[in-house]
Amino acid sequence: MAKLTKRMRVIREKVDATKQYDINEAIALLKELATAKFNESVDVAVNLGIDARKSDQNVRGATVLPHGTGRSVRVAVFTQGPNAEAAKAAGAELVGMEDLADQIKKGEMNFDVVIASPDAMRVVGLLGQVLGPRGLMPNPKVGTVTPNVAEAVKNAKAGQVRYRNDKNGIIHTTIGKVDFDADKLKENLEALLVALKKAKPSQAKGVYIKKVSISTTMGAGVAVDQAGLSASAN
Protein backbone atom coordinates (compact mmCIF):
# COMPACT_ATOMS: atom_id res chain seq x y z
CA MET A 1 0.00 0.00 0.00
CA ALA A 2 1.31 3.43 -0.94
CA LYS A 3 2.40 5.52 2.02
CA LEU A 4 0.13 8.48 2.75
CA THR A 5 1.75 11.89 2.53
CA LYS A 6 1.56 14.16 5.56
CA ARG A 7 -0.90 16.35 3.66
CA MET A 8 -3.22 13.43 2.86
CA ARG A 9 -3.08 12.23 6.47
CA VAL A 10 -4.23 15.67 7.65
CA ILE A 11 -7.05 15.66 5.09
CA ARG A 12 -8.20 12.19 6.18
CA GLU A 13 -8.20 13.26 9.81
CA LYS A 14 -10.23 16.41 9.07
CA VAL A 15 -12.77 15.07 6.55
CA ASP A 16 -15.39 12.57 7.72
CA ALA A 17 -16.09 10.46 4.63
CA THR A 18 -19.40 9.28 6.11
CA LYS A 19 -20.79 12.76 6.74
CA GLN A 20 -22.71 15.21 4.57
CA TYR A 21 -21.54 18.71 5.48
CA ASP A 22 -23.53 21.93 5.45
CA ILE A 23 -22.36 23.86 2.38
CA ASN A 24 -20.77 26.66 4.44
CA GLU A 25 -18.93 24.13 6.61
CA ALA A 26 -17.82 22.20 3.52
CA ILE A 27 -16.38 25.32 1.86
CA ALA A 28 -14.63 26.39 5.08
CA LEU A 29 -13.08 22.92 5.29
CA LEU A 30 -11.84 23.11 1.69
CA LYS A 31 -10.28 26.50 2.31
CA GLU A 32 -8.59 25.25 5.49
CA LEU A 33 -7.11 22.23 3.71
CA ALA A 34 -6.06 24.05 0.51
CA THR A 35 -2.33 24.27 1.17
CA ALA A 36 -1.03 23.88 -2.38
CA LYS A 37 1.32 26.59 -3.63
CA PHE A 38 -1.16 27.72 -6.28
CA ASN A 39 -4.76 28.93 -6.31
CA GLU A 40 -6.57 25.62 -6.51
CA SER A 41 -9.81 25.16 -8.42
CA VAL A 42 -12.92 24.11 -6.55
CA ASP A 43 -14.39 21.17 -8.41
CA VAL A 44 -17.74 19.47 -8.02
CA ALA A 45 -18.92 15.91 -8.65
CA VAL A 46 -22.67 15.37 -8.94
CA ASN A 47 -23.96 11.79 -8.91
CA LEU A 48 -27.13 11.64 -11.01
CA GLY A 49 -29.92 9.08 -10.81
CA ILE A 50 -29.69 8.17 -14.49
CA ASP A 51 -28.82 5.05 -16.47
CA ALA A 52 -25.77 6.33 -18.35
CA ARG A 53 -25.90 3.29 -20.66
CA LYS A 54 -29.06 4.70 -22.23
CA SER A 55 -28.51 7.60 -24.61
CA ASP A 56 -31.89 9.15 -23.78
CA GLN A 57 -30.83 9.53 -20.14
CA ASN A 58 -27.48 11.21 -20.73
CA VAL A 59 -27.15 14.78 -19.47
CA ARG A 60 -25.18 17.37 -21.39
CA GLY A 61 -25.29 21.13 -21.50
CA ALA A 62 -23.76 24.41 -20.39
CA THR A 63 -24.55 27.22 -17.99
CA VAL A 64 -22.97 30.54 -17.07
CA LEU A 65 -22.00 30.66 -13.39
CA PRO A 66 -23.00 33.95 -11.71
CA HIS A 67 -19.46 34.56 -10.44
CA GLY A 68 -17.48 32.88 -13.21
CA THR A 69 -14.80 30.23 -12.76
CA GLY A 70 -11.79 32.42 -12.04
CA ARG A 71 -10.07 31.18 -15.18
CA SER A 72 -9.19 33.26 -18.23
CA VAL A 73 -10.52 31.57 -21.37
CA ARG A 74 -9.13 31.88 -24.89
CA VAL A 75 -11.80 31.47 -27.56
CA ALA A 76 -11.49 30.41 -31.20
CA VAL A 77 -14.44 31.07 -33.52
CA PHE A 78 -15.16 29.59 -36.93
CA THR A 79 -17.33 32.06 -38.80
CA GLN A 80 -17.24 34.65 -41.59
CA GLY A 81 -18.65 37.99 -42.72
CA PRO A 82 -20.40 40.21 -40.15
CA ASN A 83 -20.30 37.37 -37.61
CA ALA A 84 -16.50 37.44 -37.72
CA GLU A 85 -16.44 41.11 -36.77
CA ALA A 86 -19.02 40.51 -34.03
CA ALA A 87 -16.94 37.64 -32.60
CA LYS A 88 -13.82 39.82 -32.50
CA ALA A 89 -15.75 42.65 -30.84
CA ALA A 90 -17.01 40.18 -28.20
CA GLY A 91 -13.43 39.27 -27.32
CA ALA A 92 -12.58 36.16 -29.36
CA GLU A 93 -8.81 35.68 -29.67
CA LEU A 94 -8.94 33.72 -32.94
CA VAL A 95 -11.49 34.10 -35.74
CA GLY A 96 -11.42 32.51 -39.17
CA MET A 97 -12.47 29.69 -41.47
CA GLU A 98 -10.06 27.61 -43.58
CA ASP A 99 -7.12 29.69 -42.33
CA LEU A 100 -7.99 28.84 -38.71
CA ALA A 101 -8.46 25.18 -39.64
CA ASP A 102 -4.98 25.15 -41.19
CA GLN A 103 -3.48 26.48 -37.95
CA ILE A 104 -5.17 23.71 -35.97
CA LYS A 105 -3.98 21.03 -38.40
CA LYS A 106 -0.44 22.27 -37.77
CA GLY A 107 -0.93 21.75 -34.04
CA GLU A 108 -1.40 25.44 -33.18
CA MET A 109 -4.13 25.13 -30.56
CA ASN A 110 -3.71 28.04 -28.17
CA PHE A 111 -7.37 28.18 -27.11
CA ASP A 112 -9.75 26.66 -24.56
CA VAL A 113 -13.11 26.87 -26.33
CA VAL A 114 -14.15 26.51 -29.97
CA ILE A 115 -17.35 28.14 -31.24
CA ALA A 116 -18.80 27.88 -34.74
CA SER A 117 -21.66 29.39 -36.70
CA PRO A 118 -23.75 26.72 -38.51
CA ASP A 119 -22.39 27.71 -41.93
CA ALA A 120 -18.85 27.02 -40.69
CA MET A 121 -19.48 23.40 -39.70
CA ARG A 122 -18.43 22.22 -43.16
CA VAL A 123 -14.93 23.36 -42.20
CA VAL A 124 -15.06 22.36 -38.53
CA GLY A 125 -16.42 18.91 -39.36
CA LEU A 126 -13.09 18.01 -40.98
CA LEU A 127 -11.31 18.66 -37.67
CA GLY A 128 -13.26 16.11 -35.64
CA GLN A 129 -10.29 13.81 -35.08
CA VAL A 130 -8.26 16.70 -33.69
CA LEU A 131 -10.88 18.60 -31.68
CA GLY A 132 -13.06 15.68 -30.56
CA PRO A 133 -10.57 13.84 -28.30
CA ARG A 134 -9.76 17.16 -26.59
CA GLY A 135 -13.40 17.92 -25.84
CA LEU A 136 -13.26 20.98 -28.09
CA MET A 137 -15.64 19.99 -30.90
CA PRO A 138 -18.44 22.57 -31.16
CA ASN A 139 -21.88 21.19 -30.33
CA PRO A 140 -25.32 22.84 -30.43
CA LYS A 141 -26.29 21.10 -27.15
CA VAL A 142 -23.77 23.20 -25.25
CA GLY A 143 -24.31 26.37 -27.26
CA THR A 144 -21.04 26.29 -29.18
CA VAL A 145 -22.71 25.85 -32.58
CA THR A 146 -24.92 28.92 -32.91
CA PRO A 147 -25.78 31.72 -35.33
CA ASN A 148 -25.17 34.18 -32.48
CA VAL A 149 -21.44 33.64 -32.07
CA ALA A 150 -20.95 36.96 -30.25
CA GLU A 151 -23.24 35.88 -27.41
CA ALA A 152 -21.48 32.49 -27.22
CA VAL A 153 -18.11 34.25 -26.94
CA LYS A 154 -19.41 36.49 -24.16
CA ASN A 155 -20.79 33.46 -22.29
CA ALA A 156 -17.48 31.62 -22.57
CA LYS A 157 -15.62 34.67 -21.28
CA ALA A 158 -18.14 35.21 -18.46
CA GLY A 159 -17.50 31.82 -16.88
CA GLN A 160 -19.67 29.34 -18.72
CA VAL A 161 -19.11 25.72 -17.71
CA ARG A 162 -19.96 22.78 -19.93
CA TYR A 163 -21.06 19.54 -18.34
CA ARG A 164 -21.58 15.96 -19.47
CA ASN A 165 -22.10 12.85 -17.38
CA ASP A 166 -19.46 10.12 -17.47
CA LYS A 167 -20.17 6.39 -17.84
CA ASN A 168 -21.07 6.20 -14.15
CA GLY A 169 -23.65 8.98 -14.38
CA ILE A 170 -21.45 11.54 -12.64
CA ILE A 171 -21.01 15.18 -13.71
CA HIS A 172 -17.55 16.66 -13.10
CA THR A 173 -16.95 20.39 -13.49
CA THR A 174 -15.54 23.43 -11.70
CA ILE A 175 -17.35 26.13 -9.71
CA GLY A 176 -14.51 28.58 -9.08
CA LYS A 177 -11.23 29.02 -7.22
CA VAL A 178 -10.44 28.39 -3.58
CA ASP A 179 -9.84 32.12 -3.00
CA PHE A 180 -13.46 32.94 -3.99
CA ASP A 181 -15.70 34.20 -1.19
CA ALA A 182 -17.74 31.36 0.31
CA ASP A 183 -21.01 32.98 -0.81
CA LYS A 184 -19.80 33.09 -4.42
CA LEU A 185 -18.83 29.42 -4.40
CA LYS A 186 -22.20 28.53 -2.88
CA GLU A 187 -24.13 30.57 -5.46
CA ASN A 188 -22.10 29.05 -8.31
CA LEU A 189 -22.87 25.55 -7.02
CA GLU A 190 -26.56 26.38 -6.70
CA ALA A 191 -26.64 27.76 -10.27
CA LEU A 192 -25.05 24.55 -11.58
CA LEU A 193 -27.57 22.36 -9.74
CA VAL A 194 -30.48 24.44 -11.08
CA ALA A 195 -29.13 23.95 -14.62
CA LEU A 196 -28.74 20.20 -14.07
CA LYS A 197 -32.33 19.96 -12.83
CA LYS A 198 -33.58 21.75 -15.93
CA ALA A 199 -31.63 19.22 -18.01
CA LYS A 200 -33.18 16.20 -16.24
CA PRO A 201 -34.13 13.54 -18.81
CA SER A 202 -37.84 12.69 -18.74
CA GLN A 203 -36.90 9.00 -18.62
CA ALA A 204 -34.90 9.36 -15.37
CA LYS A 205 -36.80 7.88 -12.42
CA GLY A 206 -36.37 8.17 -8.65
CA VAL A 207 -33.94 10.54 -6.94
CA TYR A 208 -32.23 12.62 -9.64
CA ILE A 209 -29.44 14.42 -7.76
CA LYS A 210 -28.19 11.65 -5.49
CA LYS A 211 -24.96 13.10 -4.14
CA VAL A 212 -22.98 16.34 -4.38
CA SER A 213 -19.29 16.50 -3.44
CA ILE A 214 -16.85 19.40 -3.68
CA SER A 215 -13.07 19.25 -3.65
CA THR A 216 -10.02 21.32 -4.45
CA THR A 217 -7.55 20.35 -7.16
CA MET A 218 -5.24 18.63 -4.68
CA GLY A 219 -7.74 17.78 -1.94
CA ALA A 220 -10.25 15.14 -0.94
CA GLY A 221 -13.95 15.25 -1.73
CA VAL A 222 -16.36 16.67 0.85
CA ALA A 223 -20.00 15.55 0.58
CA VAL A 224 -22.51 18.41 0.71
CA ASP A 225 -25.90 18.26 2.44
CA GLN A 226 -28.32 19.53 -0.21
CA ALA A 227 -30.74 20.71 2.49
CA GLY A 228 -28.45 23.69 3.10
CA LEU A 229 -28.76 24.94 -0.47
CA SER A 230 -31.42 27.30 -1.83
CA ALA A 231 -34.85 25.78 -2.42
CA SER A 232 -34.49 26.03 -6.21
CA ALA A 233 -31.23 24.07 -6.15
CA ASN A 234 -32.11 21.24 -3.76
Curated annotation (Swiss-Prot):
Record-linked InterPro entries: Ribosom_uL1_bac-type, Ribosomal_uL1, Ribosomal_uL1-like, Ribosomal_uL1/biogenesis, Ribosomal_uL1_3-a/b-sand, Ribosomal_uL1_CS
Alphabetical UniProt keywords: Repressor, Ribonucleoprotein, Ribosomal protein, RNA-binding, rRNA-binding, Translation regulation, tRNA-binding
SUPFAM superfamilies on file: Ribosomal protein L1 (SSF56808)
Keyword presence, Kinase: no
Cellular component GO terms, alphabetical: cytosolic large ribosomal subunit
Gene3D superfamilies: 3.30.190.20, 3.40.50.790
Keyword Cell division: no
Any one of the GO BP annotations: translation
MF (Gene Ontology): rRNA binding; structural constituent of ribosome; tRNA binding
NCBIfam families referenced in this protein's UniProt entry, alphabetically: rplA_bact (TIGR01169)
PANTHER family in alphabetical order: 54S RIBOSOMAL PROTEIN L1, MITOCHONDRIAL, LARGE RIBOSOMAL SUBUNIT PROTEIN UL1M
Family as reported in the entry's similarity comment: Belongs to the universal ribosomal protein uL1 family.
Function text: Binds directly to 23S rRNA. The L1 stalk is quite mobile in the ribosome, and is involved in E site tRNA release.
Assembly notes: Part of the 50S ribosomal subunit.
Protein name: Large ribosomal subunit protein uL1
